[in-house]
Amino acid sequence: MKCFLICGGAGFIGAHFVRSLLNDNHKVINLDLLTYAASLQTLHEFKKYKNYRFIKCDIRDKKKIKNIFKNFKIDAVINFAAQTHVDRSIDNPDEFITTNILGVFNLVNNSLNYWNSIKKKKQFKFIQVSTDEVYGSVSKGSSKEFSCLSPNSPYSASKTSADHLILSYFKTFNFPYIILRPSNNYGPYQFPEKLIPLIILNAIEGKQLPIYGNGKNIRNWLYIEDNVDAIKKILFKGKIGNVYNIGGKEEITNIKLVKNICKKLDRIKPKKNKRKYETLITYVDDRPGHDQRYSLNSSKIKKEINWLPKTNLDRGLELTIKWYLENDNWWKTIRKFKYKGERLGKKR
């Protein structure tokens, strides 16, 4: 039984990944600080597994991280832990810099020391879950793994810095890394500050559906289960010292995406007054430094790992909308105590 240290395993992507590993009977050590976006419901779900252990810990905590590597035999570290919402990085970049850069440094440095201390070095690897946003806005074509990194937000700059740090450890110390750069994820349990769940919940509650700028910014969407499948395949089949893009099949403007969600809600949960959800759409001031388009070339992972996304956007949105409609106890608590849907990321 392999033992995996999952950092950020109570977050959106991390929790889905932990669940998948546990279902495959792997041993999981889930390390998470339990910030505002953590899903406590999933933590309770994981308690039933005998091969699971949770440790509340900040990845910036040098002493605790060092002790974890001292007390456990770890086959791989998969780091999801990060501050991830671009708007929050505009409001408060400090947490993004310290967590996404210094925290990753702490993990990488301790992983290197651990790797140097074990005999079976070929069995260990460090996987960093990065983002497509490190490439910046793409006017033509699609970003490949060797494309220039050109971040435009404090969030993407912090993730780019972590990527560069890891690459430097590979060049300097031969550190066994793999970096993953997925496109925008969506699906069940996503904290409702992100576009898709925010639009779904605002629509259900009859609130405005805010569209930044003219709504023509383009994103590439990836259903959460497809991303988890890709990460798991790379964990077992990926090549050390490589970067892998993980992209969805479809690019779409934000306004078209929101209108698609509205049309699905009109059918799945029609309003009593028969008004269309689309009437709630409201154009608001654009996000500062808003990237126009993200686009990934994922041919490398297809060729080397034989991975392709299985869930198209139409099907993924359908599944996601139905999940939020059926799990209002989960998100109503968040809306009441953590985040009511207010605008974030305004100009200073």
Residues covered by each model-derived region:
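N-terminal Rossmann-like NAD(P)+-binding domain of SDR-like oxidoreductases, especially those catalyzing
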Residues: M1-N185, E225, L319-N327, T333, ...
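C-terminal substrate-binding subdomain of Rossmann-fold SDR/epimerase-dehydratase oxidoreductases
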Residues: F4, A15, S20-N23, C57-R60, ...
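A short beta-to-alpha transition loop/helix N-cap that caps and shapes the active-site region
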Residues: A37-S39, G136-S137, P188, T253-N254, ...
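Proline-centered turn/helix-capping motifs that create local helix->coil transitions or kinks
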Residues: N116-K119, I127, S137-K140, N174, ...
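Hydrophobic alpha-helix immediately C-terminal to the catalytic Tyr-X-X-X-Lys motif of short-chain
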Residues: S161, L165, Y169, I199, ...
